[in-house]
Design a protein with these regions (language model features):
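Short, glycine/charged-enriched secondary-structure capping and boundary segments
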Residues: 13, 35-37, 75-78, 101-103
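ADP-ribose/adenylate-binding Rossmann-like module
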Residues: 23, 60, 65, 76-101
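Adenosine-phosphate binding glycine-rich loop
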Residues: 89-153
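Preference for short coil/turn "hinge" residues that link or interrupt alpha-helices
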Residues: 22, 28, 39-42, 48, ...
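Internal alpha/beta domain cores that form substrate/cofactor-binding pockets in large enzymes
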Residues: 49-51, 55-59, 64-65, 70, ...
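Hydrophobic, well-ordered beta-alpha structural blocks that scaffold small-molecule cofactor pockets
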Residues: 2-57, 70-71
Length: 153
């Protein structure tokens, strides 16, 4: 999704070496004026993300849509692609509702628990910029763990 948190997050991630693809089904949120730093911007059907982008085992996916149903569509498709990282933004209730639907679809509890829900590190973030910072921190940490460079200071 291309909402307020994503608008804060993408510049941070690009600045620290991530390549960002933004997808939203609303052109008002998915356009070069909103995301000038994004490598690619996609306006498309969130029920068919595979038609627009290929997700693989080296990818990080941040799911930040505007509602339960869209989170469900995206998380269901993303889990099937087995990326390195999946993070889902939302309240505990929203996350529980989506997780229950995924379980009923046949995804295992282990698969669902691989997802970082809620996305980001627990820093007491409240504003979109603070939430984006907590997400960027989590992604940097996961990248460091993957490359063997993670050390707790």
């Amino acid at each position: 999704g291309g909402g307020h948190v994503a608008q804060e997050l993408v510049p941070m991630l690009v600045h620290v070496g991530f390549r960002c693809v933004v997808m939203d089904d609303r052109e008002i949120f998915a356009n070069p004026q909103v995301f000038p730093q994004a490598e690619r911007i996609i306006v498309g059907d969130l029920e068919k993300i595979g038609d627009y982008v290929s997700i693989g085992p080296r990818d990080y996916v941040c799911i930040m849509t505007r509602g339960h149903q869209f989170d469900y569509y995206v998380q269901r498709q993303t889990l099937a692609c087995h990326p390195f990282y999946i993070g889902v933004m939302g309240s505990r209730n929203k996350i529980r509702v989506v997780a229950d639907k995924l379980l009923s679809d046949g995804f295992s509890l282990e698969e669902i628990q691989r997802c970082h829900m809620p996305i980001g590190t627990a820093i007491g973030a409240e504003t979109p910029a603070e939430i984006a910072l907590s997400i960027a921190g989590e992604l940097i940490m996961e990248r460091a763990k993957r490359t063997g460079k993670y050390k707790k200071i």
